[in-house]
């Protein structure tokens, strides 16, 4: 099955329904990530090491993949696993690792609001790399849809939420921090461009790899997450002294790890049978879930910018996936 241009022609209704349900679940888990992290805060900060959460998430994905392989081993083709095909996934893990660490490093050179707005440029970089690497040409309508998607993300990041009784808009919970003037350094701008390029490249390269290899998705995931665990284990060990692996973890933190692990597996299905563009729409639509959960759980107020962003996302989906 393939979703290159929206829709799933050739799929039966039950499979179409399962695909839609999977995208909705992924959207919900993406949107819940920042509010759940906010609920983990103790005295205004996250009580555990970020590298611990990333490592545990990768380890959870690896264990789930291993379990899936054990359950479905009888349906596998005969012969030894093609271990040589595992090597390319080391680059995927490296790109994802660099991307995750750049997010943290960027905060030193710009304020959170500037990062939230400008990081939407990764939509454009992903689209360009998608066309170049996969040789998939976008129509004018689809290009306009992605521009609207970028505008929606920037609009929401600039002021989709605010504290009750405060007339000044507030960035999403993931970016919330002590008041800081808007700023970005020249080095920060260069790193942001690098971040957007790596973000797009990691997505498109992984999609290309998964589609070209005639291997079960569970085995491909096993390769990817094995390298991911090794990489993040090294980063965690090399991070210097700090809290232990599970120190500071709570029920909310465990829910963050589990939801991100499950979402990673769902995204692998999208990369295998859908496209990097589909992933962009899932991430953008998750802004709506993020805002609603922030309003309910964190008592933040929705602003006009949120409703404008929602309208732009809806229009972008209509342009990209609507009848042409």
Swiss-Prot record:
UniProt keyword list: Golgi apparatus, Membrane, Sugar transport, Transmembrane, Transmembrane helix, Transport
TM segment ranges: 19-39, 53-73, 86-106, 143-163, 181-201, 215-235, 251-271, 276-298
Domain of life: Eukaryota
Topological type in the membrane: Multi-pass membrane protein
Stretches of the chain found on the membrane's Lumenal side: 40-52, 107-142, 202-214, 272-275
InterPro entries recorded: Nuc_sug_transpt
Catalytic activity: CDP-L-ribitol(in) + CDP(out) = CDP-L-ribitol(out) + CDP(in)
Record's subcellular location: Golgi apparatus membrane
The name this protein goes by in its record: Probable UDP-sugar transporter protein SLC35A4
């Amino acid at each position: 099955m393939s979703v290159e241009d929206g829709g799933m022609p050739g799929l039966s209704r039950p499979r179409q329904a399962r695909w839609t349900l999977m995208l909705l679940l992924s959207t919900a888990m993406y949107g819940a990530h920042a509010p759940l992290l906010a609920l983990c805060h103790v005295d205004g900060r996250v009580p555990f090491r970020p590298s611990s959460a990333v490592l545990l998430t990768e380890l959870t994905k690896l264990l789930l993949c291993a379990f899936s392989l054990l359950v479905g081993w009888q349906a596998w083709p005969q012969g030894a696993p093609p271990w040589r095909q595992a090597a390319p996934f080391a680059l995927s893990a490296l790109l994802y690792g660099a991307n995750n660490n750049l997010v943290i490093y960027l905060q030193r050179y710009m304020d959170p609001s500037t990062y939230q707005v400008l990081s939407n440029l990764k939509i454009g970089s992903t689209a360009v790399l998608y066309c170049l690497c996969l040789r998939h040409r976008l129509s004018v309508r689809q290009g306009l849809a992605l521009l609207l998607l970028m505008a929606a993300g920037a609009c929401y990041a600039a002021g989709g939420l605010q504290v009750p009784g405060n007339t000044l808009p507030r960035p999403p919970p993931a970016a919330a921090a002590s008041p800081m003037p808007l700023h970005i350094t020249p080095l920060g701008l260069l790193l942001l461009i690098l971040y957007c390029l790596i973000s797009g490249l990691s997505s498109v390269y992984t999609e290309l790899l998964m589609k070209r290899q005639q291997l079960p998705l569970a085995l491909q995931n096993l390769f990817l997450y094995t390298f991911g665990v090794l990489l993040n284990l090294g980063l965690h060990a090399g991070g210097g002294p700090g809290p232990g692996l599970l120190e500071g973890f709570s029920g909310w933190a465990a829910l963050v790890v589990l939801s991100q692990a499950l979402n990673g597996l769902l995204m692998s299905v999208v990369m295998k049978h859908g496209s990097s563009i589909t992933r962009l729409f899932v991430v953008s639509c998750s802004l709506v879930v993020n805002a609603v959960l922030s309003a309910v759980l964190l008592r933040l107020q929705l602003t006009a910018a949120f409703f404008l962003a929602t309208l732009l996302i809806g229009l972008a989906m209509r342009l990209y996936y609507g009848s042409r």
